[in-house]
UniProtKB/Swiss-Prot annotation:
Chain intervals for the UniProt region annotation (Disordered): 1-32
Name of the gene encoding the protein in the UniProt record: BLOC1S5
Organism: Sus scrofa (Pig)
Record-level GO cellular component terms: axon cytoplasm; BLOC-1 complex; transport vesicle
UniProt keyword Acetylation present: yes
Protein name: Biogenesis of lysosome-related organelles complex 1 subunit 5
Family that this chain belongs to: Belongs to the BLOC1S5 family.
GO biological process, alphabetically ordered: anterograde axonal transport; anterograde synaptic vesicle transport; endosome to melanosome transport; melanosome transport; neuron projection development; positive regulation of pigment cell differentiation
Function description: Component of the BLOC-1 complex, a complex that is required for normal biogenesis of lysosome-related organelles (LRO), such as platelet dense granules and melanosomes. In concert with the AP-3 complex, the BLOC-1 complex is required to target membrane protein cargos into vesicles assembled at cell bodies for delivery into neurites and nerve terminals. The BLOC-1 complex, in association with SNARE proteins, is also proposed to be involved in neurite extension. Plays a role in intracellular vesicle trafficking.
UniProt superkingdom: Eukaryota
Membrane-spanning segments: none
UniProt xrefs under InterPro entries: Bloc1s5
Residues the record lists as N-acetylserine modifications: S2
Keyword Lipid metabolism tagged: no
Keywords: Acetylation, Coiled coil
Length: 191
């Protein structure tokens, strides 16, 4: 189908012209304007226009690419221009405003942070003092309990010694009493 338009008139001319010497016949047909030749030529043009779309498609493709590149280039130029304007606006107005606001806010924040730090240091110091007093009290209380315990243990030992002494005396008394009772029993058993 493609390329058939240029070959069709040549194929039609050869049978009508006869055998060898086709170059002369073609020249003679080309110079004479016979109706068959004109019809064949018109048929070739119609055939090539109807069936050979390469030139049209190539033209349309070139036009589309050209339009696309131009529009894309304009779009990209507009996007770059907008970006440049945004950067300029940011550098000239937004950035200094943000810097000033940040410096003002940070100075207030720094003051509040220093005040909070001082408060925390005071609270920590008070807590440490309270813990020290509490620990000192615990140590003194523990020492007092140890001394009381030692006194208690000494008292218990002395009481134990007293009780042991009383018990020993009571045992001796009981032994003497039982020894005497045995003597008395021995006297009565002789009766």
């Amino acid at each position: 189908m493609s390329g058939g338009g240029t070959e069709t008139p040549t194929g039609c001319e050869a049978p009508s012209g006869g055998g060898g010497g086709g170059g002369r016949k073609r020249d003679s047909l080309g110079t004479t304007s016979s109706p068959a030749h004109l019809i064949i030529k018109d048929l070739g043009e119609i055939h090539s226009r109807l069936l050979d779309h390469r030139p049209v498609i190539q033209g349309e493709t070139r036009y589309f690419v050209k339009e696309f590149e131009e529009k894309r280039g304009l779009r990209e130029m507009r996007a770059l221009e907008n970006l440049k304007n945004m950067i300029h606006e940011t550098n000239e107005h937004t950035l200094p405003t943000c810097t000033e606001t940040m410096e003002d806010s940070l100075s207030h924040v720094l003051q509040r942070l220093q005040a909070a730090t001082a408060s925390v240091c005071r609270l920590q110091q008070r807590e440490q003092e309270r813990k020290k007093v509490h620990n000192d009290h615990l140590i003194a209380s523990e020492k007092q309990h140890i001394m009381q315990w030692e006194d208690f243990m000494k008292e218990q030992h002395s009481k134990q010694a007293d009780v042991d002494e009383e018990h020993r005396k009571a045992m001796e008394k009981l032994k003497e009493q039982y020894a005497e009772m045995e003597k008395d029993l021995a006297k009565f058993s002789t009766f």
